[in-house]
Amino acid sequence: MGAAESINRVLNTFFNGFGIPGYLEDSIPPGAELPYLTYKPTIPGGWNEEASFHARLWYPSSAGRLPILQTEDKISAALAGGLTVPCEGGAIVLRKGTPWAQPMDNPPEGYLCEYLNFEITQLCE
């Protein structure tokens, strides 16, 4: 397994750790039910390099904003001070990007969506 695949596995585990399913943005299974999180990682080009990417929290609008904000808070708390996670050949540091969270202006009807911005640094051993 290469470094990029290892980083993708680490990110998948991270994004599935908040009580809702996490899917790669282009791999949402047919029939997936809300709520869920989608993400599209950008893997840094080399060791000690940084990249940014986003994830999206998707919730039914009928639930109001509280559940989406609670999940956002859980993810934010997990990243407090940066989260260092070992992976093949080193580790990644995952941090909140700037701006951290912002609602989607015109989500599809019946949906609420919040963008979350991340910074990722790939560190060598």
Question: Over which residues does each language-model region extend?
Answer:
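Charged, amphipathic alpha-helical segments and their flanking helix caps
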Residues: 1-31, 38-125
